[in-house]
Amino acid sequence: MISDNIKKGVIRSPNRALLKACGYTDEDMEKPFIGVVNSFTDVVPGHIHLRTLAEAVKNGVYANGGTPFEFNTIGICDGIAMGHEGMKYSLPSREIIADAVESMARAHGFDGLVLIPTCDKIVPGMIMGALRLNIPFIVVTGGPMLPGEFQGKKYELISLFEGVGQYQVGKISEEELKCIEDCACSGAGSCAGLYTANSMACLTEALGLSLPMCATTHAVDAQKVRIAKKSGSKIVDLVKQDIKPKDILTKEAFENAILVDLALGGSTNTTLHIPAIANEIENKFITLDDFDRLSDEVPHIASIKPGGEHFMIDLHNAGGIPAVFNVLKEKIRDTNTVSGKTTLEIAKEVKYINYDVIRKTEAPVHETAGLRVLKGNIAPNGCVVKIGAVNPKMYKHEGPAKVFNSEDDAISAILGGKIVSGDVIVIRYEGPSGGPGMREMLSPTSAICGMGLDDSVALITDGRFSGGSRGPCIGHISPEAMAGGLIAVINDGDTIKIDMIGKKINVELNNSEIENRLKSLKIPEPKVKTGYLSRYSRLVSSADEGAVLK
């Protein structure tokens, strides 16, 4: 066992003494050491219940002959960080979390890990750190939040972001907005739709890193506690059998995750996190081109918030990820999982599917997959749109550019009534390096939707979007403005042509004009010159490479 390096032999007497000071016994030191990586915080609703899950995990570890050690990582709430400088820290926090998991596990000689994340960057961050170690691990995601209810209608967080736009144009009163505010977020769990946190939980299960039904089992459900306890027991088995993550995370396993993502219409942020996770196995093991290639294999089969009418609880009650495997069984690759069963074995065991929620592939929500990769002179390295949450009339759009050098300027223009039907909003210098931190554009996209402009106005950016964004919002434009990408020289009034079905995005400029503009481009000074974000800005790679640190 790896832990023998800190607990075996006379020379390790001082190490054992320190462990005994924590209450561990000689008998405990004969067992596998299991790190329980918690991300509890009372700031984030997705994480307020994780102490309970950690205790269940530890009970499972003890019951199967292991010795658990709990430690914590940070966890940022994207919703609270949204719309201000705090959002610049969200994506960069993924790398801090990965480094923390790697550092703690290596320093203390753990034989295996149970990861307990919930929200957006914590899930991929923990997995990335654990993969660097290639020791057995299993993931217990914290689970979704139940939707709130007011006057017979269900609400969730995005109702508030869009409600601000509705209030601005007089569609609802301030009193109505306050009533929605008081009920929309019902308690513990990640926001109730298929936003980034829940998308990543679903893909974690699809990768084979969680037990069946873990992703969709809600935070307040006792089944989540049982899954946590079973996961604690299972990790001891994985350590004893020496089943390592790289035995599970094959190319085919990543393809399964992408297929599930495309079929469900997950968050565009998955196109950052899945390549970043895969990068810990091998450089460019998975790229944006894999999303593009696989998007032709599956249709969009689930109408889930923000682009549809269903909530995560509906997906869970419809059969969860095992039911999605079943519906996609002709496409899903048969890969191993931490449960000991293969993906197709899990699919075969499904006893019930609600086909109103998880559609059959021959009767999908949309014929096209839920995510689409576009390329063109604006984005030669690619960009991404959640086409499953776009009004079909906006699949093709041509309009004049309204250019802004920050999210804040764009929000002021939108709420100030300066955006009109037909416009293409361009927000630049918000990429991984330029932002820095690649802020999510939920506030502008929600304002557009709330004001009723989402069927006539497009938004393109080198930043990214919340999993809660809907409408014709195209993000991750690569190369970004800070790297001298063409988005940096688009001017007000330039004609932008978008063809989502044809996978194209271009600005109508001839090559000579493009060359002249790029020659005269002056890249601005970095926005942040001290602290972590300054280092991040210098070291981060492009969005099409997962925005990982070089």
UniProtKB/Swiss-Prot annotation:
It catalyses: (2R)-2,3-dihydroxy-3-methylbutanoate = 3-methyl-2-oxobutanoate + H2O; (2R,3R)-2,3-dihydroxy-3-methylpentanoate = (S)-3-methyl-2-oxopentanoate + H2O. Pfam families: ILV_EDD_C, ILVD_EDD_N. Mg(2+) binds at D78, D120, K121, E440. Functions in the biosynthesis of branched-chain amino acids. Catalyzes the dehydration of (2R,3R)-2,3-dihydroxy-3-methylpentanoate (2,3-dihydroxy-3-methylvalerate) into 2-oxo-3-methylpentanoate (2-oxo-3-methylvalerate) and of (2R)-2,3-dihydroxy-3-methylbutanoate (2,3-dihydroxyisovalerate) into 2-oxo-3-methylbutanoate (2-oxoisovalerate), the penultimate precursor to L-isoleucine and L-valine, respectively. PANTHER family: D-XYLONATE DEHYDRATASE (PTHR43661), D-XYLONATE DEHYDRATASE YAGF-RELATED (PTHR43661:SF3). The keyword Transcription does not apply. NCBIfam families: ilvD (TIGR00110), PRK00911.1 (NF002068). One of its GO terms (biological process) is isoleucine biosynthetic process. Pathway: Amino-acid biosynthesis; L-isoleucine biosynthesis; L-isoleucine from 2-oxobutanoate: step 3/4; Amino-acid biosynthesis; L-valine biosynthesis; L-valine from pyruvate: step 3/4. This is Dihydroxy-acid dehydratase. Keywords: 2Fe-2S, Amino-acid biosynthesis, Branched-chain amino acid biosynthesis, Iron, Iron-sulfur, Lyase, Magnesium, Metal-binding. Its EC number is 4.2.1.9.
